[in-house]
């Protein structure tokens, strides 16, 4: 990857801007409950009826590990610290995605990963 390429620089600036702006997602809905689509299985069951989501409720505990559950750092409950937690979560997500991308490139085309 050519870090001096103007397109690469613009892309990196975009990623940095999105990481910095990501706390807006929590601040905009701070007093209004969960953001649209961020519901847990119990919330979905409450909205549409438990009989319609019994499979979802049953399978919800299969994957219980998340590096930063709810984009949060435990104990950081006030809006300022929650915003910092969102930013840290975004940085971790970007690092994991870029790492997965490079690992996949290295597996598929080892010559491309070296250059």
UniProtKB/Swiss-Prot annotation:
What membrane topology term does the record carry? Multi-pass membrane protein
Q: Lineage of the native species?
A: Archaea, Methanobacteriati, Methanobacteriota, Methanomada group, Methanococci
Q: Where in the cell is it found?
A: Cell membrane
Q: Which organism is it from?
A: Methanocaldococcus jannaschii (strain ATCC 43067 / DSM 2661 / JAL-1 / JCM 10045 / NBRC 100440)
Sorted alphabetically, which InterPro entries does this protein's record hold?
A: PDGLE_dom (IPR025937)
Pfam families per UniProt: PDGLE (PF13190)
> Where primarily located?
membrane
Cellular component (GO) terms are: plasma membrane
User: Which keywords belong to this entry?
Assistant: Cell membrane, Membrane, Transmembrane, Transmembrane helix
**TM segment ranges:** 11-31, 85-105
**Family indicated by similarity:** To M.thermoautotrophicum MTH1706.
Name it: Uncharacterized protein MJ1570
Ranges in a coiled coil: none
């Amino acid at each position: 990857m050519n870090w001096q390429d103007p397109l690469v620089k613009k892309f990196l600036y975009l990623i940095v801007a999105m990481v910095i702006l990501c706390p807006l997602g929590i601040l905009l809905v701070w007093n209004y409950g969960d953001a649209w689509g961020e519901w847990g299985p119990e919330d979905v069951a409450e909205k549409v009826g438990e009989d319609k989501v019994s499979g979802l409720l049953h399978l919800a505990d299969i994957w219980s590990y998340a590096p930063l559950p709810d984009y949060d750092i435990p104990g950081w409950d006030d809006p300022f610290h929650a915003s910092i937690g969102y930013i840290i979560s975004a940085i971790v997500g970007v690092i994991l995605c870029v790492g997965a991308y490079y690992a996949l490139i290295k597996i598929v085309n080892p010559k491309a990963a070296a250059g």
